[in-house]
Design a protein with these regions (language model features):
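Conserved RNase H-like, two-metal-ion catalytic cores of nucleic-acid enzymes
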Residues: 3-4, 8, 14-53, 69-70, ...
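Extended two-metal-dependent nuclease catalytic cores across DNA- and RNA-processing enzymes
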Residues: 23-24, 73-250
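Charged catalytic and DNA/RNA-contacting regions of genome-maintenance
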Residues: 127-129, 136-174, 339, 343-344, ...
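Conserved "right-hand" nucleotidyltransferase catalytic core of DNA-directed polymerases
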Residues: 234-360, 366, 373, 378-379, ...
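Function-dense linear segments that define catalytic or interfacial modules
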Residues: 341-347, 412-435, 444-446, 451, ...
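Active-site palm subdomain of RNA-directed nucleic acid polymerases
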Residues: 463-475, 479, 799, 803-826
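Conserved catalytic core of nucleic-acid polymerases
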Residues: 488, 596, 600-601, 605-608, ...
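C-terminal polymerase-core module
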Residues: 507-514, 518-570, 737-785, 789, ...
Length: 870
């Protein structure tokens, strides 16, 4: 039998800093709770415990604080955004029937140790889940520790057993106490022995076994140099630190493993909490949809939509004629389009839903769909793009979509993350979801048409109230069929060239490995950070730049600083670049080439908070461009024989948008002049004539130009362009002095965000930024950068979307096809004889997509590959 216990404070703290800030519509922060539950469920699935509980700290001082006034004295107070989540977290655990333990005067660590001991005495195994390495001292044959790490929004765990601990530290787990006694622990303000670091402490314990062993052998003969004096002077501090670092296993708690057996949650209580916290995904994950109906007898139960309308199974096209009368239809379809249900909008209760089955209608099915999806038949759907793409695959050319509930919901809350129809119906219409698994498919689709009908009215009203109806009708909705057609068409890839490129990369990778192993004198795992760190900093003796808790850091920043110190470092950087190119592009793209030689990506139009499109399965928006070798990937994307690719992109669109939004006359004049804007900026910032601007000045000005859009700090700018912070500050100050409109915009937009809680693009797209009122400086600063950037980046995204719609329709009548959108760039495939006309059409439509105070400029080229056209 196995029990898993969570170090509640440690795990929720990791979750808080590992998950981006999330808030409910009422302003309650929820990211720590959400992250905690995700970590909990992931680890439950890994460990598969029979029993489960959580230990928390209390606010009262512990015996360690009484023993040493400085214990944890350097810790910052808990951020208010996390503190407000703690009581709610405990409510959630109570609703999940997960016991919570805390003991006044004792820390959660001591509860963990005590639970581990009691489990072992009862013949149980115990798994401790924590983000604190202190607990590693508890590891033995029956107690394991799963150490939680969060970085860059990602969470991972390491499982420590005695063997794993010995392999990492070269010591027994219990000796972690002795290690901390010698080296101290800054996070808990445990002093240790002054001047003794981790390496020295570890070496001492490997020689003498324990802290007692170290002091039993304390002599100038055994401890060279100043080490003897450090240990002699630090003896009292070492033993105090030993006491503070020791986790007690005798906390007075009422505990038996059997009292913590996993039980089903209190479904209704958990459902209510998750609804309040707006955890729709977790409601689905825990299967709580039906819990909405589990109410007290005294309450009037909420009624789900049940699909109780009349279902008419269409046998012939004639029976579907009422659908073609011009009334707006709500349509839901099976993923494979084997069945489709269409219901005319009706205010009364006696609604008829028409069921169209492919197997029933046979050869009449596709022609009926073609008529149903004609432009003169208005339709509302949920998430139209996959439906449109499926119709295109059947040979149907769809039109007439007048409302898309998923896209509307995305505009109303772009940070929501998920736009499943049942969730939207519950949130906006207060309709509990039906148990779809127990219903026939036609009833499920009928229910969905009813939800679409209701949401069309509700979401449409909210779009009008928030001034986003024009954005919806002129940009987002017309874009859906454009994206569907682009996904349907795909782009041709030279599979043989891609294979040959991969073979060439393999040869270069082998050469890098041989070079590195030659310097090492042995082979090792180049993908292991630990082994690579040993090679760089021990075998080669290079100076460590940065250390992490798990050892030496070997990230790109570290390698860049070491590049000139040994040729092996450049070889490692080359190895990483080459393996990335091979695995992600050379190999990855080959796997997704279709039978017709084309790759078809999926454009995500309801994902990003700024309104930009993203590309997945595969991502064709991140094809490398910064290195010549990476750019070679673009050579593999080619037109069909006798055709060319036309590539058109905007010139400095975000800076032009900034000039418009900030209404900065000097910046606008620079763009209207047609001069090189970065050179003009350099002239302004450095106070030299335009003809005297050097390439270095231009490069620095370019970094400031683009950095300002993202709220760059003097520290970041200094790092980017290799100057001192003082110089970087002078550049920024000079820039904002010359472009005073930009400076005013940077101030005003942050104040607007604080006042309204959101910012807008030129076209009215909103992004909520509740974090801008955070008491946490880092969180608030990040929110301010979002406030600065979103109107600029979001407006640029709106413009490129408008351009896509314009280009798509302007190309009608030609054979040319719009294939890809990559940020500010459009790629079109066309016959060679259409190329000049297409280039003119595309640039014209892009340049006239929006009327700004400065001209939009687009440039187009053609070529026999994406590389050649760029």
């Amino acid at each position: 039998m196995k029990l898993m216990i969570l170090d509640g404070n440690s795990v929720i703290n990791r979750a808080f800093y590992g998950v981006r800030p999330l808030t409910t519509r009422d302003g309650l922060y929820t990211n720590a709770i959400y992250g905690f539950l995700n970590i909990l469920e992931k680890e439950r699935s890994e460990e598969k415990p029979d029993a489960l509980c959580v230990a928390f700290d209390l606010h009262a001082p512990t015996f360690r604080h009484l023993r040493y006034d400085g214990y944890k004295a350097t810790r910052h107070p808990m951020p208010e955004e996390l503190a407000m989540q703690m009581p709610v977290m405990k409510q959630v655990l109570a609703a999940m029937n997960i016991p919570v333990y805390a003991c006044e005067g004792w820390e959660a660590d001591d509860v963990l140790g005590t639970v581990g001991r009691l489990c072992e005495e009862a013949g149980w195994d115990c798994a401790i889940l924590t983000g604190d390495r202190d607990s590693l001292q508890l590891v033995d044959e029956h107690v394991s520790v799963r150490l939680v790490h969060t970085q860059g929004g990602q969470t991972r765990t390491e499982r420590y057993t005695p063997d794993v601990f010995r392999a990492e530290y070269g010591l027994e787990p219990k000796r972690l106490i002795d290690l901390k006694a010698l080296m101290g622990d800054s996070s808990d303000n445990i002093p240790g022995v002054a001047g003794v670091g981790p390496k020295t402490a570890n070496d001492l314990l490997k020689r003498f076994g324990t802290l007692d062993g170290v002091y039993a052998n304390l002599s100038r003969e055994n401890m060279k140099g100043k080490l003897f004096d450090k240990l002699e002077n630090g003896r009292e501090s070492a033993y105090l630190s030993y006491e503070l670092a020791t986790i007690r296993c005798d906390a007075p708690i009422d505990f038996t493993p059997e009292n913590n057996l996993i039980r089903p949650p209190k479904r209704r209580a958990l459902y209510d909490l998750f609804t309040t916290l707006e955890f729709q995904r977790l409601i689905d994950r825990y299967g709580l949809r039906s819990a909405a109906l589990e109410q007290d007898e005294s309450e009037e139960p909420a009624q789900p939509v049940t699909g109780s309308c009349t279902l008419l199974d269409v046998q012939t096209p004639e029976q579907a004629q009422p659908l073609l009368s011009g009334v707006t239809l709500s349509i839901a379809a099976a993923d494979d389009l084997s069945m489709l249900v269409a219901a005319p909008h009706m205010d009364g209760p006696d609604q008829t839903a028409y069921v169209l089955r492919r197997e029933t209608l046979g050869t009449d099915f596709v022609p009926l769909l073609q008529r149903l999806f004609a432009a003169d038949v208005p339709k509302t759907v949920h998430d139209s793009k996959p439906l449109l793409r499926a119709l295109l695959a059947l040979g149907v050319e769809p039109a007439g979509i007048v409302f898309d509930t998923a896209v509307a919901a995305y505009l109303l809350d772009a940070t929501r993350g998920a736009y499943a129809l049942p969730q939207l119906a519950q949130d906006y219409l207060h309709i509990p979801p039906a148990d779809e698994a127990s219903l026939p498919q036609e009833s499920v689709l009928a229910i969905r048409t009813a939800c679409i009908d209701g949401l069309t009215e509700e979401l449409g009203k909210r779009l009008r109230e928030q001034g986003m109806q024009p954005l919806f009708e002129n940009i987002e909705l017309p874009l859906c069929p454009v994206l569907a057609q682009m996904e349907h068409d795909g782009i041709l890839v030279d599979a043989q060239a891609l294979h040959d490129f991969g073979e060439m990369l393999s040869e270069r990778i082998d050469a890098c490995e041989s070079l590195i192993f030659g310097y090492a004198g042995e082979t090792f795992n180049l993908n292991s950070t630990r082994q690579l760190g040993v090679f760089l900093f021990e075998t080669l003796g290079l100076p460590p730049v940065k250390k992490t808790k798990s050892g030496y850091s070997t990230n790109a920043e570290v390698l860049e600083k070491l590049r000139d110190r040994h040729p092996a470092v450049q070889a490692i950087m080359d190895y990483r670049m080459l393996t990335k190119l091979k695995s992600t592009y050379a190999d990855g793209l080959q796997k997704v080439i279709g039978p017709d030689g084309r790759i078809r990506t999926t454009f995500q139009n309801t994902v990003t908070a700024t309104g930009r499109l993203s590309s997945t399965d595969p991502n064709l928006q991140n094809i490398p461009v910064r290195t010549e070798l990476g750019s070679e990937i673009r050579r593999m994307f080619v037109p069909r024989p006798g055709w060319v690719l036309v590539d058109a992109d905007y010139s400095q669109i975000e800076l032009r948008v900034l000039a418009h939004i900030a209404d900065d006359t000097r910046m606008q004049e620079a763009f209207r002049s047609g001069e090189d804007f970065h050179a003009v900026t350099a002239s302004q910032v450095f106070g030299v004539p335009l003809e005297s601007v050097t390439p270095l000045m231009r490069r620095h000005a370019k970094a400031v130009n683009f950095g300002i859009v993202y709220g760059i700090s003097e520290f970041s700018l200094a790092q980017d362009i290799g100057v001192s912070r003082a110089e970087a500050k002078a550049y920024i100050d000079s820039y904002l002095e010359k472009y005073s409109g930009v400076r005013a915009y940077m101030h005003d937009i942050k104040e607007t965000a604080r006042e309204k809680g959101y910012v807008e693009t030129i076209f009215g797209r909103r992004r909520a930024i509740p974090e801008i009122k955070s008491s946490n400086f880092n969180v608030r600063s990040g929110a301010e950068r979002i406030a600065l950037n979103t109107p600029v980046q979001g407006s640029a995204a709106d413009i490129i979307k408008l351009a896509m719609v314009r280009v798509f329709h302007a190309l009608e009548g030609l054979q040319a096809r719009l294939l890809l959108q990559v940020h500010d760039e459009l790629i079109v495939e066309c016959p060679q004889e259409e190329a000049q006309q297409v280039m003119q059409i595309v640039t014209n439509e892009m340049e006239h997509a929006a009327a700004l105070r400065v001209p939009l400029v687009a440039e187009a080229k053609q070529g026999e590959s994406w590389y050649a056209a760029k």
